[in-house]
Swiss-Prot record:
Coiled coil (residue ranges): none
Record-linked InterPro entries: MPN, RadC_JAB, RuvA_2-like, UPF0758, UPF0758_CS, UPF0758_N
Organism: Azotobacter vinelandii (strain DJ / ATCC BAA-1303)
Protein name (database record): UPF0758 protein Avin_02940
Family according to the record: Belongs to the UPF0758 family.
């Protein structure tokens, strides 16, 4: 039986329109994206199979083009569509972040950093550069490393802060392990960057660590 034969309340698209996207399961959301199934499988069946095959929604979203295209029901066109959707989401969050001072919208900061860094397969370190009113001037990924870490050079962070004429900044990096707990190296790096930036009157307001859950704020924990 095809999805069209299901009761209206159970069809993913109708369910989304009636109850909102948050009411749908991962498989139902993916089924709407897929639009059609394959021989012997509805779009929902195919979505469940793909989620199981990849090991979950996050792994599917992080898959490269080669891994994506090897799966039945997917291909270059679907990969391109998915990348476009992800990029639109990131840009939407970036626009939202630029509307208000960063410290007045901490959830916007968290949402943006999650979208920007959570799916990175290797550790990356970046900065949100802020003006004197804590409005976002720019976000840059400054260093990229391995699964285990990234080398960060205070001189380069200082150089980019001066280039943006930033009055303050928010540090961030991801933990590909998914565990957003700071290491001793993270504490040491934060301290060194605070000291270096203080020499040119640039404040470090926070250091967010991005894992699988909500990004951890070192400032909120009293670690700054």
């Amino acid at each position: 039986m095809g999805i069209r034969d299901w009761p209206a309340a159970e069809r993913p698209r109708e369910k989304l329109l009636e109850q909102g996207a948050s009411a749908l399961s991962d498989a139902e959301l993916l089924a709407i994206f897929l639009r059609t199934g394959v021989a012997g499988q509805t779009a929902v069946d195919l979505a469940r199979h793909l989620l199981n095959d990849f090991g979950g929604l996050r792994a599917l979203l992080e898959a490269d083009r080669a891994a994506f295209s090897r799966r039945l029901g997917l291909g270059p066109a679907k990969f391109a569509q998915l990348q476009a959707v992800l990029e639109m989401s990131r840009r939407h969050l970036a626009e939202r972040l630029r509307r208000d001072p960063a410290l007045e919208s901490p959830q916007a900061v968290r949402d943006y950093l999650k979208a920007r860094l959570r799916h990175e397969p290797h550790e990356v370190f970046g900065c949100l550069f802020l003006d004197a009113k804590h409005r976002v001037l720019a976000f840059e990924v400054l260093f990229q490393g391995t699964v285990d870490g990234a080398s960060v050079y205070p001189r380069q962070v200082l150089k980019r802060a001066l280039a943006h004429n930033a009055a303050a900044l928010i540090l961030t990096h991801n933990h590909p392990s998914g565990i957003a707990e700071p290491s001793q190296a993270d504490f040491s790096l934060t301290r060194r960057l605070k000291e270096a930036l203080a020499l040119v009157d640039v404040r470090v307001l926070d250091h967010f660590i991005v894992g699988d859950g909500e990004p951890l704020s070192m400032a909120e924990q009293g670690w700054l």
